[in-house]
Amino acid sequence: MTNFTDIRDFLRAHCARYPELALQDVFKALYQSAFGCEHLIAGPSAAADYIRAEAARSGDRISKLVELLGGDYCRVHLGILQDGLSAETFARLFALSARHEECGREKLEAMLTALQTMADAGELPFSAQETAEAVERWRKDGFPPLHHSEIFRQNYAPAYRVLRRDFARALPLFARIDRLTAERSRVLVAIEGGSASGKTTLGELLQNVYGCPVFHMDDFFLRPEQRTEARFTQPGGNVDRERFLEEVLIHLREGRPVDYRRFDCATFTIAPPQRIEAGTLNIVEGAYSMHPDLAPYYDLSVFLPISAEKQRERILKRNAPAHAKQFFDRWIPFEQRYFDALDVRNRCDLILSADD
């Protein structure tokens, strides 16, 4: 967030939300917008214990607010635990959000310039001189992380962690998974959606948080003998769902190991098996994962919609022109016909937007 208009809008909204804030609270929000998490990360168990204890101390003042900061981050208030998210999952997301921001100082300086411009124009509850002097002191100290002011703590009882925005979008899914895994010995989750909607990225995040196996529908393209005109006329016919059901889903549902055989698109053959143990949590990601033949085997499903404009932008960015053309002319129309004919989006339990 280095665009002046965006910074001004953020600062105005922040001061309006917290009318009793001090200048150091504004600095803290700008620091978090530029650098993200400023806390030292304890081990997973200790971090979860801290979260539980802080939530308990907050009592009835706790909030479920997900508060957007500038840039890639947001504040997620600890009341989110009341929706079923476990402290352990929250702690892992917090740790994964802590990363070194190489351009953090540059971003912070741009935001401070905008802050001073607004103070000079009388748009903030701080004088121009007060702002300039405080910024200079902070700069001379090397921009260390700051605590909230005492007046802020008294008025607003802040209890939150800074997470990446893309992680926070998936919090409803994490909460549902945590509730299910607390109740059941085995949970299967499907991530459905169109090309470039973020299915693989979400699957990787779930794997990083839970250490669970992830299975990809893209490993089950049709074998040469299946690629018939009749097959391609079927909504959802563009995947070897029969092999996926027999070799993967049934095994996972029964808690048996999977001898996972990927389809090799270079040779049009099936690779030798790789043994994968069924987990407590098992993720299936990819278009066609919620085909009616497969859907009954899942405990939870999520659909990732994406606008045509964003989809096109992402596909062009990650593919050579000839390959991108295949998506636009062939694969996306196949997917859209499947989504429409089988009402896939509405049959999923959750919908999480992939658009920014």
Regions found by a protein language model. Name each.
Residues K199:
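Conserved lysine of the Walker
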Residues L202-G203, Q207:
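Post-Walker A alpha-helix
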Residues I270-R318:
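ATP-dependent NMP and nucleoside kinases share a basic, alpha-helical "lid"
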Residues L188-A190:
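Short hydrophobic/aromatic beta-strand immediately N-terminal to the Walker A/P-loop
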Residues M1-R153:
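Long, basic/Gly/Ser/Thr-rich N-terminal segments
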Residues N155-A182:
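N-terminal pre-Walker A segment at the start of P-loop NTPase domains
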Residues Y210-H216, F220-I276, L281-V284:
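Conserved nucleotide-sensing/catalytic segment adjacent to the nucleotide-binding pocket
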Residues G194:
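P-loop (Walker A) phosphate-binding loop of NTP-binding proteins
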